[in-house]
Amino acid sequence: KDIFHTGYNLDGLTAYEEQTGDKSFHSNIEKGFDFYIRNFFEADGTPKYYHDRTSPIDIHCPAQLFVTLHKLHRSDEYRAEAERVMRWAVKNMQDRRGYFYYQLKQGVSSKISYMRWSNAFMFCAMSYYILDYGK
């Protein structure tokens, strides 16, 4: 139901398909990706936690996009979307000291620098971004 578990599930199904040659879930992967890309992002690159509401925005919300685009071999097709989401994430979720915030929400946001949850996952996502787009 949420953005990052949806992306993670698509990644897992794709890995299964590629490693086994079993294409029986391929139409489900395509339908799931179509839902993911159409419903979890605003036009300006803002990620939505759930398909029907934005808040809270966890760092995994924008980060998962880059992993999923790479693993589903859709990076070229969705480059403009990826660039919008990366700009949004850096502008809104990166501290001026370089680390990434855990979560933005109305009222009180958690701008704590968690090594595993926020930074490691966003650095992983940025690695895929650099690998796919060379920036």
Predicted regions and their residues:
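Glycan-recognition and catalytic cores of secretory/periplasmic carbohydrate-active enzymes
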Residues: 1-135
